[in-house]
Amino acid sequence: MCDQQEIQCCGPIPQCCVKGSSFGPSQFPYANNQVLVEAPCEMQFLECAAPCPIQVSQTPCQSSTTEVKGQAPCKTTNVKCQTKTTQVKCQPKTTEIKCQAPCQAQVSCVQCQAPCQSQVSYVQVPQPPQTYYVECAPVYYTETRFVEYPVSNYVPVPAPQPGYTYVECPSLGQGQGQGSFSTRYQYQGSYGSCTSQSQSRGSYSSCGPQHQSQASYSYCEPQFQSRPSYTNCGTQRQSQASFGSCTSQLQSRASYSNCSSQRRSGTSFSTCAPQCQGQGTYGSFTAQRKSQSASRCLPSRRLQPSYRSCSPPRHSEPCYSSCLPSRCSSGSYNYCTPPRRSEPIYGSHCSPRGRPSGCSQRCGPKCRIEISSPCCPRQVPPQRCPVQIPPIRGRSRSCPRQPSWGVSCPDLRPCAEPHAFPRPCRPQRLDRSPESSWRRCPVPAPRPYPRPEPCPSPEPRPCPRPRPRPEPCPSPEPRPRPRPDPCPSPELRPRPRPEPCPSPEPRPRPRPDPCPSPEPRPRPCPEPCPSPEPRPCPPLRRFSEPCLYPEPCSVSKPVPCPVPCPAPHPRPVHCETPGRRPQPSPRSQPCPHPEPMPRPVPCSSPVPCGDPIHCPSPCSGHNPVPYSQELGCHESNPCRLDTEGPSSYSFSQGQESNGCCVSGGVFSGSRGLSGCGDQGNTYRGMNCGACGGTQGAYF
């Protein structure tokens, strides 16, 4: 059978019927209705091995025509009789008719297109009333063709049209991309089972796979056109999930080598990087869910631009839960405040970044100028670094310059940290940044020792825990600690500690003088009224400013108390950690230690600047800055400044004064990256130009 000899049959393509050759039934009928068919000499014949080994015989054309459908390995032949032919019936015995090859001029009625090329030979015959289809499985022979007509194989069918009827049998072996025949469309309805498909295998990897992929492709045929882009339909099916139809894939194909690869491409880009671009094109891909950075690629890319080196915004996580640039006025911050903690941001600028010790390592806090010094000379020269630090703290360059300043800072940090912690956002950074700052600056360690005493003054800062600001005001009292009376007022702040309350009497003393008006505000919380003094305490938060200038702060603070007191309260609301501040409140007892605070007094050099006064003035509400100062106050601690100041805002150079700090500085950015107390991108704050010798610090 041809299938058995498929290779042989298909092999000698040239042996197949030559295109242009024609053969037709001889005009000489033979007995038994056998017809001798003459064909061109060059024509090869196939022998059909079948139960009835009979060559197709055609009688002179009768009213009906017989069409023989021969499936041959090399070719299929369609034979139509131009004249009416009588139906040949297969007897139990079939006679064989050998086709004589002698070339006859008379043989012209049948055209045989070379099956090797077209795989189909068409025979055109005037339409007979009936057409008989005879199937014979030819076996390849060089010279003879045997056609058998089992009676059962005859299927009478009316001719489809008055024109010519074409009958094709897809040949088994040879499919050279000629897969489509004019008649093929009869079968084309679905390649459900087209043996010939194997022939067109050149075009289709396999018809079976096509069916599988048909879910995505309405037809296999489209694959022909799309084929160049698709290795095989099977693969398309896999990608099908991503694309409604692979047909569209073709367009997108340019970016993706294949559908399945696209799915894999999701790995390279959280979502396929191309998908971000093509996201409009593709509603959504299963792969997109893979995007880890963001629900959508686009935002993540935006994040990257917004934070050039802020890959570690994790430090700023408090601020950027989703790393959305909008929350942090990233535009204003080349680096998220956290980046300073994430030295990696400054890796290029600060080789020391890696090491925990050394302010240079703080370079990461580049966001905070104080840290910017050695590591980040570009942002701020080392000399600036100290200067910048005071601006953040609102104190003075002198403090940052002096390791002692750092000493005070540690204490302030403990105290201030509670303050900062109340702010949900900052506390995290505070924790981290202070730690990092400690690591970075070994100097602070010594500072803590002296500062333990100052720390009590920060404890008044815990009074700020009431940051309703009343408590912060008490912190200023610790600054006034030189004013023993104010110190008791911090105790009042711990008001839970009634014992310290006795000191409140001193507090009233400051109250009448500094803030008679503040008292009304404290009146909402009468005890907080002393807090107005604590309001100056926020300058302490600013770092050691209040500590450095406790008296100035306290003096002005009482006055500021009235206005800021109400405002701070909302901020305390933001600060959930006030409890921590109360913890320092015990330190408020150390508040008597304000004497250590005089140590900051060296830093008090800023006092002349009156910046502390400015701090209180915000506290007092004299400055529109008060809220920013509250931030400043929280940030007042040098340690916290590292964490808070920059995160909350950046200093604008525009504010510069010989007096270390001048209120009215503009901070751009939100108070806290966390969004705590975010009040817009600009904030007024202390700007230290003269102290640091720098106009301003950029975060």
From Swiss-Prot:
Its main location: cytoplasm. It is found in: Cytoplasm. Residues 448-533 are annotated as: Disordered. The modification Phosphoserine is found at S436. This is Keratinocyte proline-rich protein. Keywords: Cytoplasm, Phosphoprotein. It comes from the Eukaryota. Expressed in the stratified squamous epithelial layers of the skin, esophagus and tongue. Residues 448-477, 513-533 have a biased composition (Pro residues). InterPro entries: Keratinocyte_PR. GO terms for cellular component: cytoplasm. PANTHER family: KERATINOCYTE PROLINE-RICH PROTEIN, KERATINOCYTE PROLINE-RICH PROTEIN-RELATED.
